[in-house]
């Protein structure tokens, strides 16, 4: 047909038919890529990958388009002129266009495959990391399996994310299996991979396997670093393995990482902390001496570990000495340093020194925190110096540091224990003015103060106010009121409170029943007290010797030793481990004398 066209031996109608045929050929040529794709790449893999991404912009559709319109001349009047050279030119152009189109198609398929692989790897790896961070480890493992099945292996960073997620979730066996798979099919695990798995093994107390993995790292061409050693040493210290008798083990661990590396401050800190916790003060100070000899720079963390260890062992003089050495070396004490010393002084009852150190702390430019005030306020209240504790509470407010509700409760309870309910109410009102909401412990402290002063009506009023502020009374609330009612002889009121407890779903405890037994004995209703005691035993509540002792003492005072002895035998039947049995007989003997 091309020969006829070039010679001009066709009519216009035939020419139109030929044009339609060539347009059909163009349509077929546009779809050749779909027909030839299975030849250049695997059909299943190609379709799966191509569905993941859009067609790359670099691959244009006209690369494989056969420009047949150029085969025809624009000349319409051929005048029956024969031109054999034109025929060969047309055939040559057709062949060249077909070969160019075939080469372009092959290049397009190869580019599509390469683009799809890299893009899928990046997208799927990102999804896997997100799944690990969200804790969806099963989905991440499933995606990894699918990627490997399709010939795409996630990178090392993605595998490390997966290892970290598995270890944090406690799936240590899966993490161990993943490392083995990485060694077999890639990517090869690095030091971070091993550190993650070793830390996971140590977290589940499998230190033996962690040590084995640590020792086999060199076999796979991975040299442990300082992080690896820190993890191992910390785990061994927690287990109590590293001590005076096995210092050689520590040296082997350190030699495995970097033979010429200086002594690591983190390892030294871990060792000293472990020694102090195990009571090995001398060994801890030997580590410090070795640090000084090797010129290892000490920071505030190292000094805080030493000072805390010395304070725990009661060596306050040495603790002060290290604080002075700390300042000489240009390391400023921080809030943890002062809190450690203040806490130790309060435990020893040296509140004047603790308060002076608190002032030194402020003068030195270190702002006290909640713990600094909490230690002193609690210590002063326990020691009975509530007014001074209240001064520290006010000092917090002046420093724009709002005390937590616990500190308010401690001061209110301190005043309440000494019967100073007016001061307790003043602190409560100040607490409310600063927007701190009272809780059940606040009200219990106030009730305790009223009960201590014999003001049962005021205590009852506080209980009713609790319910109006949507604070539910607890067992302690009822025990305080019930005990006060029994002490004042209001036995009926005490049992009303007991019934209210049950209605409100508040479970009585041994203190509740002990107060009721005491009230019944005080009223002389001993048989009912014995009956209540039997009911207590039937409920299965853990019972101590106190209610038996109250009842036995009452029988002894009434010169009824036989019944007192029966109570003692009932106590023997309980076999309570908390108190020795002869204690009741000793009290009974004392009462008889």
UniProtKB/Swiss-Prot annotation:
Keywords for the protein's UniProt record, in alphabetical order: Repeat
Pfam families named in the record: PPR, PPR_1, PPR_2
Cystine residue pairs: none
Domain of life: Eukaryota
UniProt xrefs under PROSITE patterns: PPR
Coiled coil (residue ranges): none
PPR-type repeats, residues: 120-154, 155-189, 190-224, 225-256, 264-298, 299-333, 334-368, 369-403, 404-438, 439-473, 474-508, 509-543
Family affiliation: Belongs to the PPR family. P subfamily.
UniProt xrefs under NCBIfam families: PPR (TIGR00756)
Protein name: Pentatricopeptide repeat-containing protein At5g24830
Upper classification of the organism: Eukaryota, Viridiplantae, Streptophyta, Embryophyta, Tracheophyta
């Amino acid at each position: 047909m091309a020969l006829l066209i070039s010679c001009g031996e066709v009519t216009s109608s035939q020419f139109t038919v030929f044009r339609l045929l060539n347009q059909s050929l163009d349509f077929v040529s546009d779809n050749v890529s779909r027909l030839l794709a299975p030849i250049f790449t695997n059909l299943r893999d190609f379709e799966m990958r191509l569905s993941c991404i859009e067609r790359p912009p670099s691959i244009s559709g006209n690369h494989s388009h056969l420009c047949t319109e150029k085969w025809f001349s624009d000349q319409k009047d051929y005048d029956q002129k024969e031109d054999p050279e034109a025929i060969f030119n047309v055939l040559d152009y057709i062949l060249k266009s077909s070969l160019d189109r075939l080469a372009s198609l092959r290049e397009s398929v190869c580019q599509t495959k390469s683009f799809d692989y890299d893009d899928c790897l990046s997208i799927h790896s990102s999804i896997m990391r997100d799944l690990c961070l969200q804790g969806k480890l099963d989905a991440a493992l499933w995606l990894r399996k699918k990627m490997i099945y399709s010939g795409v292996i996630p990178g090392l960073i993605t595998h490390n994310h997966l290892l970290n997620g598995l270890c944090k979730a406690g799936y240590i066996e899966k993490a161990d299996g993943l490392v083995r798979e990485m060694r077999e099919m890639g990517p090869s695990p690095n030091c971070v991979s091993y550190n993650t798995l070793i830390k996971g093994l140590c977290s589940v107390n499998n230190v033996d396997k962690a040590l084995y993995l640590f020792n086999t790292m060199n076999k796979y061409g991975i040299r442990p670093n300082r992080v690896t050693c820190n993890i191992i040493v910390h785990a061994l210290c927690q287990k109590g393995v590293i001590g005076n008798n096995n210092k050689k083990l520590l040296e082997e661990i350190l030699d495995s990482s970097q033979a010429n590396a200086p002594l690591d401050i983190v390892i030294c800190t871990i060792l000293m902390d472990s020694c102090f916790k195990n009571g090995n003060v001398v060994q801890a100070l030997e580590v410090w001496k070795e640090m000084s000899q090797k010129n290892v720079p000490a920071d505030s963390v190292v000094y805080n570990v030493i000072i805390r260890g010395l304070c725990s062992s009661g060596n306050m003089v040495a603790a002060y000495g290290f604080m002075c050495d700390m300042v000489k070396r240009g390391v400023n004490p921080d809030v943890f340093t002062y809190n450690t010393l203040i806490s130790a002084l309060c435990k020893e009852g040296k509140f004047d020194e603790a308060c002076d150190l608190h002032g030194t702390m402020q003068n030195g430019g270190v702002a006290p925190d909640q713990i600094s005030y909490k230690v002193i306020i609690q210590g002063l209240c326990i020691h009975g110096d509530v007014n001074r504790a209240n001064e520290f509470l006010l000092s917090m407010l002046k420093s724009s540091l709002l005390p937590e509700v616990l500190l308010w409760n401690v001061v209110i309870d301190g005043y309440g224990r000494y019967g100073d309910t007016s001061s307790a109410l003043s602190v409560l009102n100040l607490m409310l003015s600063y927007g701190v909401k009272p809780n059940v412990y606040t009200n219990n402290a106030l009730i305790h103060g009223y009960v201590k002063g014999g003001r049962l009506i005021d205590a009852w009023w506080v209980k009713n106010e609790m319910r109006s502020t949507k604070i539910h009374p607890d067992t302690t609330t009822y025990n305080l009121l019930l005990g006060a009612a029994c002490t004042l002889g209001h036995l009926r009121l005490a049992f009303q409170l007991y019934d209210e407890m049950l209605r409100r779903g508040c479970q009585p405890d041994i203190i509740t029943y002990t107060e009721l037994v005491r009230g019944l004995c005080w009223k002389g209703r001993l048989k009912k007290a014995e009956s209540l005691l039997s009911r207590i035993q039937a409920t299965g509540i853990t019972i101590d010797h106190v209610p038996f002792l109250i009842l036995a003492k009452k029988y002894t005072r009434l010169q009824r030793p036989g019944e007192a002895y029966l109570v003692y035998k009932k106590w023997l039947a309980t076999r309570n481990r908390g108190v020795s049995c002869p204690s009741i007989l000793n009290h009974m003997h004392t009462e008889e004398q």
